[in-house]
Structure formats: structure tokens, C-alpha cells
A protein has these predicted regions:
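Short beta-strand element of the alpha/beta-hydrolase
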Residues: 659-670
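A flexible loop/linker signature enriched in serine peptidases of the S9 family
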Residues: 259-261, 279-294, 307-312, 327-337, ...
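Non-catalytic accessory segments flanking enzyme active sites
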Residues: 260-267, 274, 278-280, 285, ...
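Accessory carbohydrate-binding/adhesion or oligomerization-edge regions at the termini
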Residues: 18, 22-98, 118, 210, ...
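Active-site-proximal cap/loop segments of hydrolase catalytic domains
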Residues: 684, 690, 697-905
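Beta-strand-rich ligand-recognition modules
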Residues: 141-228
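Aromatic-lined ligand-binding clefts that engage carbohydrates, nucleic acids, or primary amines
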Residues: 121, 126-140, 211
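Blade-terminus and WD-like Trp-Asp/Gly-His loop motifs, strongest in beta-propeller folds
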Residues: 266-275, 314-323, 359-367, 425-433, ...
């Protein structure tokens, strides 16, 4: 079952120190700054309505600074009142382990000083932090308040409040370890044993953990302004596992890419003089997030307008003006707004529209084409008659239709009707015609849909059929002159004209191609048939009449230019490994995109397509990653015994030493997509490497981006050859890299990769452990039960069914080979997964349990195919890391702490 637990950095365990700890580490290295003068508020001696004067405790607990995302370092200045700067100084403790906070500078005003240290842990550890001082202080660890001491002892003054741990002032419970007494007290002698103490129980994963202590000294206090801190731990750990230091350099952790402001998209204005950038920010500790869009000028990056806190959506540029339109919603009804950014004028175009589902401007800005969704019937019936496989999905009975708003007059016109949804593709450059499609199920021929493409003259309402009864769908956009359509679809979209595979093979229609379709005579030119990369998106630019293709090129995602006159492709240097999205100015040779290098977080760029020069537009991550170090990422390919070249790459730890031996994680998907060079992937390879693992990522045959023949190997394979390629690749990688420990190799994958993980463990004992997320154990049950099982199988298992292909549905299903598994396997799945139902993991778990094989199953409550809820993703991530540590590092403590075996018998 899913374990409801937040980020397990800090746990409030009510355990006396003497029961858990055998050893301790003194925090001996500190950064300090101060003293900083503060003031009591006016009338602080006057009792409030509860009869209490303003106390030193209240002054201490007032947040003078925002310490979120603040990382002290020696020589860096802390900015105080009136812009005064105070440098952080490196300090060491005296022989008794005490550090001086600061030399007090005033006897008539209260003062604060700040101490900071970075606790480096080389593995997950459990222990207890103890802090001692004669003065008042508060402590934060990784940005969370962990304790407050509001007493003064000895010559410092009289006690005025109780000490406590945690955030009790905010209603959170914590263990009251303020007056810890243990067997060590007899030995404390020299450690000023009369000082009050604050303790807090810790659980720290591998990495750096920032401890900041704010100390307050009231006027005329006389005791030494000093602090003693130590971390106690039990015999499972060693002193080398816990090292306080003042260097903020660290490795990537899960919060680096879960938290902070992240840029999600950037869109240039029509003339390229402005750009709209969209952001997303998580709001921990909740599962909520906020999104917003800002408009900037290109020339000086000045903010033109911010829509933060405006609750808008669907923001788009008008085609020919520095103006945007967007929608707001109230009580289920939508209002469409327009905002002229040159004049500042705002106006409402349509108001209180029911069931609004989208909009698009005509290029001449005369019309707004919008979509209304009509709700289907019968979804709340207790006895529901299913009208085909798609009817299991909640939205299948809904229908969407097209409407037109005449912007000048405000007159609205309905454009389409019927029993099939009409999906808008594009509007012609002159604003007169639009292209739309309809789709309907056809269960007698794969891929079980038929598609029609239409063109409508919006002045006469005359509608012509461009394509009828097409088995494979296409997406289309008009050429700049309106004479052609740029179509994207699979190799079989227009028959065999787009296929480039040997005789006898079946094309992989997830390998998207680009075509030029003539509206005058219906002829089709397959422009990418000899182009190995797969098409992610395509744009026929009116500014230069060239086609720009964002393409999956092996494990990269790159930008290519197709010269429509010379009919050739050029690679454009974007400076990135993986572009997540790109948008183009409609009237200028300017584009803007978001992407990343393999070892650098995403940033937003602009590129001038005339000379292919680029500039950074938005960088929200560099400061957050300023102290994060990464290891090397290197390419590594091998020639399989089949003669195919199998591509791959591997990630090394930041402190890599070729003379050492490292555990290895092999990550594979094995399906139709390569594992791209993304940075914040759900399976973050550079984070795994930062935890002391070598991560080998390979791209077996069947992946797109390597040419159609390579991708077609996915069809009717289901691991027949791919499993051997992965095993062979692992063996050859280990042989070629002496620093990779062959006895400590794990394998992981998700979805199809989860299926491959299970299948691999039925074929070999090469791996020490495996992790399968949302994997398929029984191809037949996935085919019949998953929402898209049968339709995905239309490509992956073309013309093969459970009744005619035992060699796939039985022989390649891990469930039927479960008795061959000897390797510990972790099965993870969302308990609400509609793509690969959780039963796929449950079946394999049941089989392995009954066989007495080592297996664990975690169901993540309320999650679908991907784990996206903030706090659940953190716990899911920790489960993965704890499993790796247990089986590849012989460090079971983290896993056992998270998932103790209560039913061991």
C-alpha cells in the first residue's frame, strides 16, 4: 500500500537519545555572520490584550530574513537593514566543541547572529541533532524550522519560556527534547553542561543539508555567545557517513527540480519584438502549484505586463499585432479577453460562454474560431452499456464542434454539427478556409480508427473532402501561400509512399514523418522518407518559406531546417541537447524555445533564423544549481551480435575515481521511444549518479530517431530481440569499464520499460535487482484491460492477437515465466493507472510471492500512469533510492525505515 509520509528528511521521533545512539559527531566547522542589531517594537513593555508584554521569545521568532533558497558561503555578504552588508566568516570550534557566534557590539540593544553549516551525508542516515547555548536560538534544517530555545541560563539571564522542537507556533507537533538528559552528561564536564539544549531526530538522505541557527542576545547579557552542536548516531553508521563542512557544493537532489520557479514555454510576438514566457512553481508542503505568464520586450528584457495571480488560461498572441487573447472562467462559464500591449487597451470579445474548449485566430484577425464541447449522456448510469472500447473513457461520449466569432461585429456562427467531433487543424492564410477532421472507431481493421479530412469555405460553407477513410491520422497546417498542407503522421499515413523499410517489415507508425499535400491535385511528397530523425513538430514559416522541424534525433531533440527550394535538411545549432518546445514569430524569422543540456537545467532561448544566432531569454535555474556539481556524461555504443549498432550513454558520479568500483544502474525503455537527454526526467539519471551510481542508458532496436528500419523492429517484438540486446549491452558495458562492479548491477524501466525489466529477470541472473514501474506482466490482460492496450497493440502487435499468437502473448509475457525469476524485484504502480492497470504489477507480485521469490509491491494511492502529485512523488522517489541502496550498496536501513515488514513470519 502507499505509505502516507512527507519528505523524510526530519522525523519527530519521541526517543531518548541514550536508547538509539552510540556515537556522535561534533559540528566543528561553521559559517557565522553578525552581530546584527535589532530593536524591540514600540510599547514592548506594555501588556497586550492577554496581559503579556513583548518577550525576547517573540523577538527571536520574528522572521527578520527569508532564509528560503539562501545558501551561505565564506566571503558572501548577508544584507541587513539599510543595505548594510555583513560577511559570512569561516569559524572552527574550540577544544570543547563550542563556536563563538559573534563579539557583541552593544549592551543597550538586542542583537542576533547567524551560524550555518552544511551536513554532508554519504548515505542515508538516522540520528539526532543536539544544540546547546546559554542564549535564545532557532534552528532550520533544509529550510524547515526544527527547534526553538527561548531560555537563557547562567549569567545570560533568567528563563522566560520553554524550549521546544519543531514548529509548535504553527500548530505542528514535535518532540520536546529541550531538556535532554542522558548518560553522556557525566562526561560533559567541560561542555558547559548547564546550558539548555534543543534536540531533533533526523533522517537524512545522501547529500548536503543546510543547518542555519539564528541566535539572539538580549541587552546586558554576559554569558559567552556560543553554540555547541552534535549529531548522535547508532552502530549502523560511521563518522565518515556524517561530515559537517562549510562548502556549499553538493549533488543534485529531488528538490532541485521539484521546487523553484521553472520556465515551461516561451512564445514570441508576431514581429519578434516581445515574448510571452510561462512559469510554474510548486507550493510545498502542499500538492498545489501556481502558473502564470509574463510579457517582456526582446531588446531590453523589460517587463511589459505580468498575468501572475490573474487566473487566466489559453493565452496566445494575435497573428499580426502585439496583442494577446486569453480566457477567464467563472461558475463554469468562459470569457474571452483581448489585451493590446502597445496601447494597454483591454476588451472582452465573448462573455459567459458555456462548455468553451479552445480558440484560434484567423491569420487576418477578422475571426476567432472556437470550440464548444457538448456533454455526452449516460455516464452516471448504474448499469452502463459500453458502446465500444473507447466508451470506457469518461470523455468518449462528449462531442466538440466549431464556431466562428466575427470580431468586428460580435456576430457568432456555428460551423459544424453532427454525431462526430470536428477537430480544427488550421485556418488558411487569407482567413477564408479552414481544415478540420473527424474520426470514428472501426474495429475491423487496425489501428481501429478511420479518419476524414475536410476543407470548408467559411463564406459559402461549401465543404470538400480531402482525405476519406484514412486508417492512420495526420495533423495538417497550411503552407504560407495556402496552396499546400504540411502534414505529419506515421510512415503509413499515405500508404507506402512514406515508408522506408525492407520488404516483409511492418512500419512503426509512431515514427512520425512529414509530408507536403497539394490542395490542387492531391499529390503527396514525403519529405522525410530518407530522413532518420522522427518528427516531433513541424512549422512552415511564412517569413522565409522554409519548414522547421523539431526532431527526435537518436536520443537528442534537435531543430532542423528543410529548404523547400533545395529540398534538403540543415541542422540548426541551438546549443542544447533536448528542446522540449518551440514557437515561431508569425511575421519575423525569430523563434523561441525551452530546452536543456544533458547536465544543465532548462532555459529559454531566442534564435534568429536568418543567421541562426541565439540568446538566453530566461534562466530560472542557474542560481538554484549554482552549487550543484555533476559528473561526466559519455556516449557508449556497441555492435550487437545481430549486427545492429546500439546507442547509449552513461553518467558518472561527480567525484568519480576510475580506480574505484561503483554499482551500476541500467535504465532502458525498450519500446518505441528513445530515452531522451532530458534533465528533470521522472528517473533523473544525474541524480542517481550523484548518489554514487554509474547509470548506463541504452536505446535498443525499435526506438524512433534512428531511421524507419530501426524503429520498425518494435513491431511484433515484445522483447524477442530487445531483451538479448539489453543483456548483451550490459555485459559488454561491464567488460569495457573496469570501474563498473559486475556484482552490483540493477536494471529499471517504466511502462514498456517496466515490462522489459520483468522480462529481463526471467532471462538472466546478471542483475542484482530490478525496479519496474507500471510494467506489463501479461500482454493479453494489458491488451484487453488498459484503456489504450488494444490500440497500442495495433502497432506493437500488428495483426497479432491472443488467439493466434501464443509466441507473443504467452511466451513473451513475464507472468508465464515468473518461475525463472531469482532476482529481487520492486514493483511500483499508481493504483489508478488506466494505461497499464495496476493488476499488471499485482499479478506478477502474486506469482513471485507464491513462488517464494524476493519481491515487493508499492501501490501509490490516487496516481495514474505517472506519479505527479508533489508529496507522493517525493515518497515514490525515496522508495526507489532506498531500494537501490539496499540491493546495490548493502545499505538496507533506509528501505527498512520506510517499509518495515510488520508481517514477517
Amino acid at each position: 500500500m502507499f505509505k502516507t509520509k512527507l519528505l523524510p528528511l526530519l522525523m519527530a521521533l519521541v526517543l531518548p537519545l541514550g536508547l538509539m545512539a552510540n556515537e556522535k559527531v561534533i559540528v566543528s566547522q561553521w559559517l557565522s555572520t553578525g552581530p546584527l542589531e535589532i530593536n524591540y517594537p514600540a510599547f514592548h513593555e506594555t501588556p497586550n490584550v492577554e496581559g503579556q508584554p513583548f518577550s525576547n521569545r517573540q523577538l527571536l521568532m520574528f522572521d527578520h530574513l527569508d532564509l528560503n533558497d539562501y545558501y551561505p558561503e565564506a566571503g558572501k555578504n548577508l544584507i541587513w537593514l539599510d543595505g548594510a552588508s555583513y560577511p559570512w566568516r569561516a569559524e572552527t570550534t574550540d577544544a570543547d566543541g563550542f563556536v563563538a557566534a559573534a563579539d557583541h557590539a552593544s549592551d543597550d540593544k538586542p542583537q542576533v547572529a547567524y551560524l550555518a553549516t552544511y551536513i554532508r551525508t554519504d548515505r542515508w542516515i538516522k540520528g539526532q541533532l543536539e544544540m546547546r547555548s546559554p542564549y535564545l536560538f532557532e534552528a532550520w534544517l533544509n529550510g524547515k524550522k526544527i527547534g526553538t530555545k527561548s531560555t537563557m541560563e547562567g549569567a545570560a539571564g533568567e528563563n522566560d519560556a520553554d524550549n521546544h522542537s519543531g514548529d509548535d507556533d504553527e500548530g505542528n507537533s514535535g518532540s520536546d527534547n529541550s531538556n535532554i538528559e542522558d548518560a553522556d552528561d557525566a562526561d560533559d564536564g567541560e561542555l558547559r553542561g548547564s546550558y539548555g539544549r534543543v534536540g531533533h531526530d533526523l533522517e537524512l538522505p545522501r547529500g548536503k543539508h543546510l543547518l542555519i541557527i539564528k541566535m539572539m542576545r538580549p541587552p546586558e547579557a554576559e554569558s559567552p555567545w556560543e553554540m555547541h552542536a552534535s549529531i548522535a548516531y547508532d552502530k549502523s553508521f560511521t563518522a565518515n557517513d556524517i561530515q559537517p563542512e562549510i562548502n556549499p557544493e553538493t549533488t543534485k537532489d529531488i528538490l532541485h527540480f521539484m521546487d523553484g520557479v521553472q520556465v515551461t514555454s516561451v512564445r514570441p510576438s508576431p514581429d519578434g519584438s516581445m515574448y510571452a514566457v510561462s512559469y510554474r512553481r510548486s507550493l510545498p508542503p502542499t500538492d498545489r502549484s501556481e502558473t502564470w505568464t509574463d510579457i517582456h520586450r526582446y531588446t531590453d528584457d523589460a517587463l511589459v505586463h505580468s498575468y501572475r495571480h490573474a487566473s487566466i488560461s489559453r493565452l496566445t498572441w494575435l497573428p499580426d499585432a502585439n496583442a494577446v487573447s486569453y480566457t477567464t472562467a467563472l461558475n463554469g462559464r468562459t470569457t474571452v479577453h483581448m489585451h493590446d500591449l502597445e496601447t494597454g487597451k483591454k476588451e472582452v470579445l465573448m462573455e459567459n460562454i458555456e462548455d468553451f474548449a479552445g480558440k484560434r485566430w484567423s491569420p487576418d484577425e477578422r475571426h476567432l474560431i472556437y470550440t464548444i464541447r457538448e456533454e455526452g449522456s449516460g455516464h452516471d448510469e448504474s448499469m452502463r452499456h459500453i458502446l465500444g472500447m473507447q466508451d470506457r473513457q469518461a470523455h468518449f461520449r462528449h462531442r466538440s464542434f466549431l464556431y466562428r466569432l466575427d470580431v468586428e461585429t460580435g456576430v457568432r456562427t456555428r460551423l459544424t454539427h453532427g454525431n462526430l467531433t470536428t477537430s480544427l487543424h488550421d485556418i488558411s492564410p487569407d482567413g477564408r478556409s479552414l481544415v478540420f477532421s473527424q474520426s470514428r472507431p472501426d474495429y475491423l481493421e487496425r489501428p481501429y480508427y478511420k479518419h476524414d479530412l475536410f476543407i470548408m469555405d467559411m463564406e459559402t460553407f461549401e465543404t470538400d473532402t480531402l482525405l476519406a477513410d484514412k486508417r492512420w491520422s495526420v495533423s495538417t497546417r497550411f503552407s504560407p501561400d495556402g496552396q499546400y498542407l504540411l502534414a505529419t503522421g506515421g510512415p503509413s499515413a499515405f500508404g507506402r509512399i512514406g515508408e522506408n523499410i525492407p520488404e516483409g517489415m511492418i512500419a512503426n507508425n509512431y515514427d512520425t514523418q512529414a509530408y507536403i499535400f497539394s490542395l490542387s491535385d492531391g499529390t503527396v511528397k514525403p519529405i522525410t522518407v530518407d530522413f532518420d530523425p522522427t518528427v516531433a513538430s513541424a512549422h512552415w514559416h511564412p517569413a522565409d518559406n522554409n519548414i522547421y522541424i523539431l526532431a527526435g534525433d537518436q536520443d537528442y531533440r534537435r531543430l532542423y531546417r528543410y529548404d523547400t527550394r533545395r529540398e534538403n535538411f540543415d541542422l540548426i545549432d541551438t546549443g542544447l541537447d533536448f528542446i522540449s518546445n518551440i514557437q515561431y514569430a508569425s511575421k519575423a524569422r525569430v523563434a523561441a524555445y525551452v530546452g536543456n543540456e544533458v547536465n544543465a537545467p532548462p532555459r529559454a532561448y531566442s534564435i534568429y533564423l536568418r543567421r541562426d544566432s541565439r540568446d538566453v531569454l530566461v534562466d530560472t535555474s542557474s542560481e538554484r544549481y549554482r552549487h550543484v556539481s555533476f559528473g561526466e556524461v559519455a556516449d557508449w555504443t556497441f555492435e550487437a551480435s545481430t549486427g545492429k549498432t546500439i546507442d547509449g550513454r552513461y553518467y558518472l558520479p561527480p567525484d568519480f575515481d576510475p580506480e574505484q568500483s561503483y554499482p551500476v544502474i541500467v535504465y532502458q525503455y525498450g519500446g518505441t521511444n528513445p530515452v531522451g537527454r532530458t534533465f528533470g526526467h521522472r528517473y533523473p539519471f544525474n541524480l542517481w549518479a550523484g548518489n554514487g551510481y554509474i547509470v548506463y542508458v541504452l536505446q535498443p532496436s525499435g526506438a524512433t530517431g534512428y531511421g524507419q528500419e530501426f524503429s520498425a523492429a518494435h513491431v511484433n517484438n515484445w522483447g524477442k530481440t530487445v531483451a538479448d540486446e539489453i543483456i548483451e549491452g550490459t555485459e559488454k558495458f561491464l567488460e569495457a569499464h573496469p570501474f563498473a562492479d559486475p556484482d552490483r548491477v540493477g536494471v529499471a524501466g517504466a511502462s514498456y520499460g517496466g515490462f522489459m525489466t520483468m522480462l529481463l529477470l526471467t532471462h538472466t541472473d546478471l542483475y542484482a535487482t530490478g525496479i519496474s514501474h507500471a510494467g506489463i506482466s501479461n500482454i493479453a490482460s494489458y491488451w484487453g484491460e488498459g484503456y489504450w492496450g488494444y490500440s497500442y497493440s495495433a502497432e506493437a502487435t500488428a495483426n497479432k492477437f491472443p488467439w493466434n499468437s501464443r509466441e507473443i502473448y504467452v511466451d513473451q509475457s513475464p507472468l508465464y515465466r515468473a518461475d525463472h525469476v531469482n532476482t529481487p524485484l520492486l514493483l511500483l504502480t499508481g493504483d489508478s493507472d488506466t494505461n497499464v492497470p495496476p493488476g499488471e504489477s499485482i499479478q506478477m507480485y502474486t506469482a513471485l510471492k507464491l513462488l517464494g521469490k524476493p519481491v515487493e509491491l508499492i501501490l501509490v494511492e490516487g496516481e495514474d500512469h505517472h506519479i505527479v502529485t508533489y508529496n507522493r512523488r517525493l515518497v515514490w522517489h525515496d522508495a526507489i533510492m532506498a531500494w537501490w541502496d539496499k540491493h546495490l550498496k548493502d545499505q538496507p536501513e533506509w528501505w527498512e525505515e520506510q517499509y518495515p515488514d510488520f508481517l514477517s513470519f
